[in-house]
A protein has these predicted regions:
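A structural signal for small-residue-enriched, beta-sheet-centric alpha/beta enzyme cores
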Residues: 1-91, 95, 101-409
Length: 409
């Protein structure tokens, strides 16, 4: 299937506008945008997936309640305070939805809140009461609207994350756009981040949720920065249906094409998140091939990108492939490592470092050149089957400790 990258992020699909403003949630950041608003022209099919952490943010509880009917029309997101472990958290999130509903003239039940920031801090409605009218007045269905919203949800991110692609369904051009944040507290099992997707494809709520839950295990659940599962991780998608394609109401060819498009944009966003890990200097992608089954392929690739020893080796540009084999070896499951081969690759070239679970002669000098690049691909061929999977992570640096040591200051 062919995809065309387009500008505009979440505003690229038909029927969506967005804005980002400063409302004062972060008292020590006088100018930083900290409130994002996303609005659809029509009531949309919608779906969400959330953190697996038992301690979850108040907005997630509200989202689950508001999405029971499978529809939404707006998303309100703040950065700087997680609204987690706060006595009034749910009531405050509901009040935010009321404010958005009033400003936009929509049902508050069709508003989905999200928060990111420091856990366990008091939170008041005043900044939202100021910021929501300002955001509503600033809504724009263009590149700037998406960019402002993407900026407003950032915390320790070093740059905004947005992407959009076009593809064809039922003879109609459809678009999917995304913004996301997250560079720390990122670990497999929907941990890490906030991500908001919009599409103008016509998809029923049931099939939209199924598509999202089909895509997440092989993308967002395959990403890790630090093995910390956040309390607020949220991925929400809204589908306006304004592209005019026949509505996807069954698992037909159009459904599978839609899932493929969602997978493509999710993989891109995962690489963006992992490559911008706190203090990171390298994006690490592990691609496992010829595994005995999908479960093993996913588990092995996750083990490699989660290995602190290997992450530290990449930071030091050290082709210590033994740490890769070690990570593969402690991966749960019943599989053979006897035929495992490993290559390290980047735009500077490729080195073959391990063959049949043993040393393969290579140049340390060439390996260091490969590992000097930002994007590193670890190719693991298990030689025992046909399954494959990817996982995304980053190196472990001194700055990761610095950033998290200073997080609340």
């Amino acid at each position: 299937m062919q995809y065309q990258e387009v500008a505009g992020g979440i505003c690229a699909p038909k029927g969506f506008a967005a804005a980002g403003v400063h409302c004062g949630i972060r008292a020590n950041h006088a100018e930083k945008y900290d409130l994002a608003l996303i609005k659809a022209d029509v009531r949309c099919a919608a779906a969400g997936v959330y953190t697996t952490n038992k301690v979850c943010g108040a907005p997630i509880k509200v989202d689950r309640a508001h999405l029971k009917d499978g529809y939404a029309q707006a998303i309100i997101v703040n950065s700087g305070n997680a609204n987690t472990c706060a006595a009034n958290g749910v009531a405050l999130a509901e009040e935010c939805c009321e404010l958005v509903g009033k400003e936009l003239g929509i049902d508050p039940q069709d508003v989905l809140p999200a928060s990111t920031g420091v856990i366990g801090q008091p939170m008041v409605i005043d900044p939202f009461a100021r910021g929501i009218p300002a955001a509503a007045a600033k809504l724009a269905a263009d590149e700037q609207g998406s960019a402002d919203a993407a900026t407003a949800i950032m915390t320790t991110d070093t740059h905004k994350k947005e992407y959009a692609i076009q593809f064809e369904l039922g003879g109609k051009v459809c678009t999917v756009g995304a913004i996301g944040k997250g560079s720390g507290m990122i670990a497999p099992n929907m941990a890490t981040m906030l991500a908001f997707y919009t599409t103008d494809a016509a998809v029923s709520p049931i099939l939209l949720e199924k598509a999202l839950k089909t895509v997440v295990p092989g993308t967002y659940n395959q990403m890790s920065v630090d093995l910390d599962t956040s309390t607020n991780d949220t991925l929400i998608i809204m589908a306006s249906g304004l592209a005019g394609n026949p509505e996807i109401c069954e698992e037909n060819a159009d459904y599978h094409a839609f899932v493929a498009a969602l997978t493509a944009i999710a993989e891109h966003m995962c690489a963006e998140h992992a490559g911008d890990g706190e203090g990171a200097t390298h994006l690490i992608t592990c691609e496992v091939t010829h595994a005995p089954d999908l479960k093993t392929a996913r588990a092995v690739s996750r083990s490699v990108v989660c290995s602190n020893l290997f992450k530290a080796a990449v930071f030091g540009r050290d082709a210590n492939w033994g740490r890769i084999l070690c990570a593969i070896g402690y991966t749960p499951g019943d599989f053979s490592i006897d035929k495992v081969c490993v290559r390290l690759s980047s735009k500077a070239g490729e080195v073959y470092v391990c063959e049949n679970a043993a040393y393969h002669p290579y140049s340390e000098e060439e390996a260091a050149k490969v590992l000097a690049e930002h994007d590193i691909l670890v190719k693991v061929d298990m030689g025992t089957g046909d399954a494959s999977a990817k996982a995304w992570g980053c190196d472990l640096t001194y700055d990761y400790v610095k950033i998290n040591g200073d997080y609340r200051t």
